[in-house]
Amino acid sequence: MNGVAFCLVGIPPRPEPRPPQLPLGPRDGCSPRRPFPWQGPRTLLLYKSPQDGFGFTLRHFIVYPPESAVHCSLKEEENGGRGGGPSPRYRLEPMDTIFVKNVKEDGPAHRAGLRTGDRLVKVNGESVIGKTYSQVIALIQNSDDTLELSIMPKDEDILQLAYSQDAYLKGNEPYSGEARSIPEPPPICYPRKTYAPPARASTRATMVPEPTSALPSDPRSPAAWSDPGLRVPPAARAHLDNSSLGMSQPRPSPGAFPHLSSEPRTPRAFPEPGSRVPPSRLECQQALSHWLSNQVPRRAGERRCPAMAPRARSASQDRLEEVAAPRPWPCSTSQDALSQLGQEGWHRARSDDYLSRATRSAEALGPGALVSPRFERCGWASQRSSARTPACPTRDLPGPQAPPPSGLQGLDDLGYIGYRSYSPSFQRRTGLLHALSFRDSPFGGLPTFNLAQSPASFPPEASEPPRVVRPEPSTRALEPPAEDRGDEVVLRQKPPTGRKVQLTPARQMNLGFGDESPEPEASGRGERLGRKVAPLATTEDSLASIPFIDEPTSPSIDLQAKHVPASAVVSSAMNSAPVLGTSPSSPTFTFTLGRHYSQDCSSIKAGRRSSYLLAITTERSKSCDDGLNTFRDEGRVLRRLPNRIPSLRMLRSFFTDGSLDSWGTSEDADAPSKRHSTSDLSDATFSDIRREGWLYYKQILTKKGKKAGSGLRQWKRVYAALRARSLSLSKERREPGPAAAGAAAAGAGEDEAAPVCIGSCLVDISYSETKRRHVFRLTTADFCEYLFQAEDRDDMLGWIRAIRENSRAEGEDPGCANQALISKKLNDYRKVSHSSGPKADSSPKGSRGLGGLKSEFLKQSAARGLRTQDLPAGSKDDSAAAPKTPWGINIIKKNKKAAPRAFGVRLEECQPATENQRVPLIVAACCRIVEARGLESTGIYRVPGNNAVVSSLQEQLNRGPGDINLQDERWQDLNVISSLLKSFFRKLPEPLFTDDKYNDFIEANRIEDARERMRTLRKLIRDLPGHYYETLKFLVGHLKTIADHSEKNKMEPRNLALVFGPTLVRTSEDNMTDMVTHMPDRYKIVETLIQHSDWFFSDEEDKGERTPVGDKEPQAVPNIEYLLPNIGRTVPPGDPGSDSTTCSSAKSKGSWAPKKEPYAREMLAISFISAVNRKRKKRREARGLGSSTDDDSEQEAHKPGAGATAPGTQERPQGPLPGAVAPEAPGRLSPPAAPEERPAADTRSIVSGYSTLSTMDRSVCSGASGRRAGAGDEADDERSELSHVETDTEGAAGAGPGGRLTRRPSFSSHHLMPCDTLARRRLARGRPDGEGAGRGGPRAPEPPGSASSSSQESLRPPAAALASRPSRMEALRLRLRGTADDMLAVRLRRPLSPETRRRRSSWRRHTVVVQSPLTDLNFNEWKELGGGGPPEPAGARAHSDNKDSGLSSLESTKARAPSSAASQPPAPGDTGSLQSQPPRRSAASRLHQCL
C-alpha cells in the first residue's frame, strides 16, 4: 500500500441495553456465562513451494482500540476498581494489524485454507501483537519449509465485519468532500437476543431528563445532544463530566446540536439504564471488547477493571448521521473538531484516534472534555461524589438561546493526542513530549489551568456561573512519575499553515484566551471569530514525521521528530482564529498569535501535504537519494520526495495549490509556509518569482515530442526564475519586480530561451543521466523536454519541489484530484513519447491497422515497470553530447539486450492474452490475424514465409510489444504470420505435448481399439499442465476453424497435421530414432485432435464414455522399423535385412494400405497419376505406328503396378536383364548372384526418417506430386552428382520381389531435374543430337529412358522381366528416343522458386552418401570405354539405356547426356559395340535393386 497505513478506527455496532445485574467480564464488560458464536482463530500449516514460496502476500493496518474499551480503562483507573479492591491497570494502545492481501491460486497457502482478508494472529506460535510489520515479515521469511499461521478468518473477524468499507474501499486514497457524505457502515447481523430492561436506576439517570425512552442518558452521546428538549443543569453537567473524565466539565446543551439524529448511537461496554439497544449490537460490542481484551498485552503492576464506562460513539463510525448543516469546508479530516459548538455544526468526521495513556479519542470527547494523560489516575470516586461536588463548568453548555463563549475552541483544534505504539519508531519519539496542550476553555475546570476567559452566558438551567473546582485527586496524581513520562503522549494540534512552535519546559498548562465577544448563534456556518488556533510546530511536529511500516524512517527523523498519531494521516487543521496565550504546563508548546488563513481551505490542504508526501515515498527513494528525506538549511526543511512521477501525479493537485496567494495574504508572512519550506520563503517578497538561481540546461525534445536540433542540445548556463506558471531562462540575473516579470514574459531575446510553461508538467530527477550530477528532467504539457543541472543535490531537490508546487493546471481542484484524468494524461504522454523515438516502426500510425492487436500489445507493455515507462524515448540518447565522465550508478542501462519475452521461453513465462491468461499473447494474436484474413488463403500454414522477415519479427517481439507497427508490411503477409506461429511452438523449451507425456501419447496412438485409443488420448490431454492444456485447446480450435474452410484453403486436417505434427508432438531433444519411429504417430495424433476437437476439449464429461469413432475403426501402425538399422551405419549391398530409403518409404506407404488408412491409397495413387497418363498417351501413339518394341512390353508390364492390367502384354520382350547378359562379361561383374533373388539394399544413401517420411506424406496435398517428388528426390540428385554412373541401371528394375515393389511411386525427371545443375549442363551439350535423334524417325512409344517409365519399370514382375529380351537395334533406337524426350521435358519444365530450392537444399543435408563396392563402373571408366572406338558409343548408349530403366532417373539422365553428345547413333549392324554392355547391365541391375 506504498506505506499508507489505513487506520481501522472506532467500533461500529450500536449500543444495546444490557441488564445491569449481569456480572461483567474481567475486561470487556461482557458476561462470561453468555455464549457467543465467535469461534476464534484457526491454525494453518503451510508448506513452502520452491516456485511460489508460501504463496501469499500481506498488508498492514494500524488498528486503534474502541472508544468503549479505552473509556473503560480510564474509568476503572479513576475509580480504582469497581469492586473496591485494587485491580491491575492496563493500557489499550494502537496495534499493528496484518491481513492477507493476496493468495496465489493453487499455492501452498491456498491449499492450506488461507484466504484473502484473513488476519494474522500468530506466526509459528509467536503472537504478532507487539511486533511491527517488518518483524512479522522477517518471522515468515525466516521460516523453514513449513509455516504455522494462526489466523482469524475474514468472515469471523469483527474488525473487518464492522469496517469492511473502510478496510477495502478507502484504504489507498484520501477522502475528499464533506464529512456528512461518508457512507453508513455495513450492518452486522448476529442472532438477536432480548434482554429485560434494567431494574435499577443510577444517579446519572436522575440527573438527565429523558424525553423519550430511546434516548440514551449519556450526554456525551450525540443522541443525547440531539434532543432539543433535553436540558442539563450545570451540576448535572459537572457530574456527568466527572463521571467520564474524573473531573467536572460542562457539556454542550442539546440545543447546540438541533440537527443531530435522535437515534441512540452511543456504543458502550454496557448500556445506560433506561436505554434500549438491539441485542445484536450488544453482542457485537461484547465480542469486540472481548477480542481487544485478549489482544492487548497487560503491563506489570496494572490493575484490571471489571467494567467499562459508557462511551460516546465516534462520528466516523456513525458515518456522520449527526452532521449539521454543511460548513463551507470541502474536505474531511480525520481529527477535526466534531465536538464544536452548535452554530459551527459537526461537519468533520471523527476518527477514533485512541490514546495510550489518556486512552481517549480526541474527537469522541465532547466540546468541553479533554484529559491529559496525567489525569488518567484520577479515581472515579468523583463520579460517585459528583452530587455533593459543586458544579464547576468552565464553560456552560450553550443552549439555543445563548451563544457560545467566544474563546471556546473545539477539542480537535486543541491538538492531537499521540500514543505509545508497539512500533519502535513510535516509541523513540514519545520521550520528547509529556503533556497535553490545551487551548480552550473546557479545561478551565482542571485545577492546573489558569484561564482568562470572557464571561459567557449560561442557560437558565444553570444554577451558578462556572467556576474552577479541583477534583478529589490532587495535582500530584495528575503528574506521572518520571519513569512513565517517556511513554506518555500529548495532545497537539497541527495548525494550518505550519508555523514553528517553541517548547517551554513548564509542567503546568496555562492557557490565556483572548477576550472576544461571543459569536451569535446565527453564525453557525461561519467562522468562529472568538476561536483562535495555535500555529503549527516545525516539521518535526508535523505529520510528515509519521513512520509508515512499508518504508524505513530516517534516524534524523526519529531523533528530532515529535510524536504524532499515525491515524492523523489527514491533518485536522481548522478554519479558526488562533488564541493568544501560552501553555506553561506543556513543556513542548508555545502558541504564537494572529490569524493568517482564510475560508478557502488552502491552509487545511497545505497541512495535509507533508504526511501524504511521506506516504507515497518508497524505500527506493531513500536508498538512491541518500539523505533525500531531510535537508535542513537555515530553517528550511525538505520533505522526502517520491522518485516516481506517476505516484506524485496522482496527488499533485492534492498537495500543491499552485500559488502563494493564501500565503502571501497571511498576516504572519514572516513564518515560512510548510509547503514552501525548500525555498527561503521567510525572505521572499511579494513578487511573482517563486524561486530563482543559476542552472545549466539543455533541451531534448521540442513541441510534440520532436527531437531537438543539435544547437539546442548543448548545455548552457542560465539564470532561472520560477513564476506561477512559467520558468524563465536568461543569461543574466534580473532583479525581481514587475519590470523583470515583463522582461521575462517578453522573453526571449535573441540569446535567451523562451519561458518554459510548467503547467501540468512532469518533473523528477533524471535517473538516466549518468554523465552529469544533480540533473533533473522537466517535461511540459506539450511534450517539450528539458534537462537542468543544479549546483548541488539540495538545490536540485528544491527546484523539483518548487516546480511541482507551481505546475497545477488551471481549474484543478487540489482536494479532488481525478485519478482517471491523470492516468489519461500519462497515457497520452507515453504514446506521444513512444512515437518520438528513433524507430520508424514505432510511429503512432501503426495503431490504425489491426487496432485490436495493437491495443493487445500495448496493454501488455503497460504492465512493465513505471521507471522504464515514464522515461520518454528521447531520454535514451539525451546524453550523446554530454561529457564522457560518468558518475554514480547507471540506473538504467542503455542498449542493454533484454531477455526474450516471446520466443524460446516457457509457456508460463510468456505474456498472456487478455481473453485467456493461460494462452500466450503471440499465439492469440497470430491466430486472430489468420482467422481474420487467411481462412480462404490457399495453403495457409503450408506455404512458408520469408525467413528473414520472420526472424526480424521474432527479434522485435522479444524486445517487447510496445513498439510494434502493424502497418508494417511484415505484418501484412499471412505466410509470415503463420510461420511466426509455427516458429513459436518450435522454439518452446518444452513442447506443447510435454516431455514426460510424450511416450504416453505415442503409445496411446498405437492402441488398436479405436474407442480405447480416443479415451486414452483424452485423458492424457486432460492431464497436461494448465498453460499447456489451454494453449493446445486454443490452437486446435483454431486449426479446426482452418480445416472447416478446406474447400477454399485446401488445408484438410490431414494437411494441417503434416505441418503441425512434428512441431507440437516432439521431445525437447532432437532424437533421430524418435524422428524415424514416431513421425507417423505425430501426424496421426494432431489429425485426430483436429477432427474431434469438440470431443477432446469439451468441458462436460461423458457419462457413457461415448467416443466419436467406432470400436472397429482400425489404427495404422506404420511399419518403419526397417529404417532404424540404417541410422548411423552402411548396409552391404546384399543384406536381406535392409532396404533402400526410397523403396522403404514406398514400403511403408504400402504397409498402410492393408490397414485401410483413410488416405493410404491416395498416397500411392497420387504419385503415379502424371506418369500413368503420359504412358497411356505414348502407348496409344506407339500402337498406332504398329511397332512392337520392348517399350510396349514395359508399359504393359507396368500396368499392374500403376493400376492398369494387360495380361496379354506380359510375354512381350523386355530390355535386357542382368541374369541374361551376365555370362557375356564374367570378368567384370562376376561376384553377386542374380539380384532378383535377394531383397533390394541401399548402399548409397541413409536418409533420416524425418525427411523421408515428411517427403513421403507431403505428397498428400500435392496435386501432381510435384512438391513431394522435388523434395524427396533431392537426395537422389545429390547421389547422382557424387556417383552418377556407378548407379547406372537398366530395365532390371524389376529384379527383386515384385510384390514388395509394386507400390513404389514413380518420380518424373522434370521433378527431379531442377536442382541438378550438372545434368542440366550435360543435357545442354547433348540437346542437338538428342533432338535430331528424336525427330529422325517416327514417334515411338516412351522409351525406358523417360522419367516416368524408368520408375514404372521397377514395378514389373520378375517373370515378365525374364521372358522378354528386345533386340540390340531396338534397344539402341529406343535409347536415342528416350534421350530426346527427356531433353524436351527439361526444356518445358517450369523453374522453381528460390524458396523451393532452399527447402530442397535443406532436405539434402539429411542424406549421407557412401562409396559402393561397385567401383568398377564409374563415370571415368565409362568415358574411357565410350571413347575406345566405334563400338563404344553404342555401348555407352546401351549402358545409358540400362540406366534409364532404373528408379533414379535423374542419375540416368546425368549419365545419358554425355553419351548422346559424344557419339552418333551407330549402324544397326554394328553388333560388336555391345559386347561390354551385358556386364554393365548386370551391375546396374544389382544397384537398382539396392536403390
Curated annotation (Swiss-Prot):
Phosphothreonine found at: T656
Biased composition (Basic and acidic residues): 482-491
Site label Arginine finger, positions: R942
Residues modified to Phosphoserine: S361, S372, S423, S517, S583, S611, S623, S659, S662, S677
Any Gene Ontology biological process: regulation of small GTPase mediated signal transduction
Region (Disordered): 15-34, 204-280, 385-407, 449-530, 831-851, 1126-1155, 1175-1367, 1420-1491
Domain PH: 688-808
Biased composition (Polar residues): 1138-1148, 1245-1257
UniProt superkingdom: Eukaryota
Tissues expressed in: Expressed in placenta, prostate, hippocampus and brain medulla. Also expressed in brain tumor, salivary gland tumor, head and neck tumor.
Keywords, ordered alphabetically: GTPase activation, Isopeptide bond, Phosphoprotein, Ubl conjugation
Range of residues in the leader sequence: none
GO CC field: cytosol; extracellular exosome
PROSITE patterns in the cross-refs: PDZ, PH_DOMAIN, RHOGAP
Gene Ontology molecular function: GTPase activator activity
Domain spans labelled PDZ: 71-155
Record-linked CDD domains: PDZ_ARHGAP21_23-like, PH_ARHGAP21-like, RhoGAP_ARHGAP21
Protein purpose: GTPase activator for the Rho-type GTPases by converting them to an inactive GDP-bound state.
Protein name per UniProt: Rho GTPase-activating protein 23
Organism: Homo sapiens
Lineage: Eukaryota, Metazoa, Chordata, Craniata, Vertebrata
Gene for this chain: ARHGAP23
